[in-house]
Amino acid sequence: MAFRTLDDIGDVRGKRVLVREDLNVPMEGAAVTDDTRLRSAAPTVAELADKGAIVLVLAHFGRPKGERNPEMSLALVTAAFRSVLGREVRFVGDCCGEEAEAAVAQLQPGDIALLENTRFHKGEEKNDPALAQAMAKLGDLYVNDAFSAAHRAHASTEGLARLLPAFAGRSMQAELEALEKALGKPEHPVAAVVGGAKVSTKLDVLKHLVARVDHLIIGGGMANTFLAARGVDVGKSLCEHDLKDTALAILDAADAADCIVHLPYDVVVAKEFKPNPPTRTVNVHEVAADEMILDVGPAAVEALGDALKTCRTLVWNGPLGAFETPPFDTATVALARTAAALTKGGSLVSVAGGGDTVAALNHAGVAGDFSFVSTAGGAFLEWMEGRELPGVKALEA
């Protein structure tokens, strides 16, 4: 897929550049508790400012539902963004209209302004052309650097890109290039790890992947549904029994596409789901009626590691077990470390995404060793489903 980037933007000196970023950071009181998204936004904003642009940052924050809510004002994020950038950032109390126009008129080349939460306007999430037009009045050029919001056709992500010359920022560019490498034009064999609690939330992902990957590793609670579909008694494990036929259809589609599906054959079980309860490691056919499967067993994890050693590309979304609760993080940590070692050794391109996945890789201490880790949740999932992302489509050259 060809798209325009900052390399194509030309001379920006004195130009007003509207830059859509994802600054939707977690807060505790007045403090930002994780500045990952601010750090991800910094390179594009700094590059444009250094080149003499007047940089106008657009972003959403929380879900104010079209109402002004001081608890969701981007004023709360301004100091942290200033600190990450290491330069002055002015806050402007609206993202369009007279107040914003007057504030922007005062700015000089190289200045950076953070405009107020786009979702304070009802038209943002409706992709209202009038709101997009009002925001477009502030700028000469548009840069979208928020892949995590690219699956939404909103006024500040899709509408604006139709009204001004539109380009991908550095974070968006890195994300798109990594995703293209992982599933667009990957080097085979390709493995996908898909985990999480429910098959129902990842149905479209699984259906899309079986025709595109060589190894499909299914973990988490959703593996129980596939095991049950194959006649395994999963005890009181989380399981969507009503989706057994769907699971069988996915397995049949995988067979037809020569995709090897890896389900656990040994598992870690417990009678209670709590930190460090008594556990047993058993064959999947030995789960007692009062036990639940909470992690993949060591023999299966070793076999999964061996499968990864034969692969050139890995896409990972979702943990293998209930990783937030020890000791059920063991399988996820072990396989993540294997993938990280293969990546560092140069034999594997590894791309991971989704909130739980990032948390799991951080927990394993290997997020920095993967080829690319996406902080996007919904957008990453929709990309894995093969859907067209409106915010990306609008940037195509």
Swiss-Prot record:
Top-rank EC class of the record's enzyme: transferase
Entries under InterPro entries matching the protein: Phosphoglycerate_kinase (IPR001576), Phosphoglycerate_kinase_CS (IPR015911), Phosphoglycerate_kinase_N (IPR015824), Phosphoglycerate_kinase_sf (IPR036043)
Pathway connected to this protein: Carbohydrate degradation; glycolysis; pyruvate from D-glyceraldehyde 3-phosphate: step 2/5
UniProt keyword terms in alphabetical order: ATP-binding, Cytoplasm, Glycolysis, Kinase, Nucleotide-binding, Transferase
Ligand binding (substrate): 22-24, 37, 60-63, 119, 152
GO BP annotations, alphabetical order: gluconeogenesis; glycolytic process
GO cellular component terms attached to this protein's record: cytosol
Catalytic activity: (2R)-3-phosphoglycerate + ATP = (2R)-3-phospho-glyceroyl phosphate + ADP
Residues where ATP binds: 202, 324, 354-357
Subunit structure: Monomer.
Family: Belongs to the phosphoglycerate kinase family.
HAMAP family xref list: Phosphoglyc_kinase (MF_00145)
Protein name: Phosphoglycerate kinase
